[in-house]
Amino acid sequence: MLQPKKTKFRRSQKGRMKGNAQRGNRLSFGSFGIKTLQAKWITGQQIEAARIAVTRCMQRQGQVWVRIFPDKPITKKPAEVRMGKGKGSPEGFVVPVTPGRILFEVEGVVFDVAKEALRLAAQKLPVTTKFIVRHDYDFNILK
């Protein structure tokens, strides 16, 4: 499970996600990627499930970059507990993503394989995504 080794504070405020992604919104490593079209929290388990789906579909060829990391602690109160009496105990970690944020990047496979692999990854995630291709990608390569 993805989580930070050490955090400065055990609990954090919920915060608000407004606007589009200002950072992490361009392909930096691979030729293909998926970017979000919604604002949502993504957990470490969801990221790991999507990563496994991509690597299995690509049959361990090429390279995959995960561009997000869950570093926001989430708390939860036990079942059937009355309101109040303080904030709940830490439950796990999430990453808040806003529209335009690149989640995964892929390199070293043909277009069709990359598109299918990232489609499978998108099904594991709670956000709607869009498949994107690097602007200078040559479609005649690797055929």
From Swiss-Prot:
Name under which the protein is recorded: Large ribosomal subunit protein uL16
GO biological process per UniProt: translation
UniProt function note: Binds 23S rRNA and is also seen to make contacts with the A and possibly P site tRNAs.
Matches recorded under HAMAP family: Ribosomal_uL16 (MF_01342)
Family: Belongs to the universal ribosomal protein uL16 family.
Subunit structure: Part of the 50S ribosomal subunit.
Residues covered by region (Disordered): 1-25
Organism annotation: Azobacteroides pseudotrichonymphae genomovar. CFP2
Biased composition (Basic residues): 1-17
UniProt GO molecular function: rRNA binding; structural constituent of ribosome; tRNA binding
Top-level taxon: Bacteria
PROSITE patterns: RIBOSOMAL_L16_2
Keywords, comma-separated and alphabetical: Ribonucleoprotein, Ribosomal protein, RNA-binding, rRNA-binding, tRNA-binding
This protein's GO CC annotations: cytosolic large ribosomal subunit
Pfam families xref list: Ribosomal_L16 (PF00252)
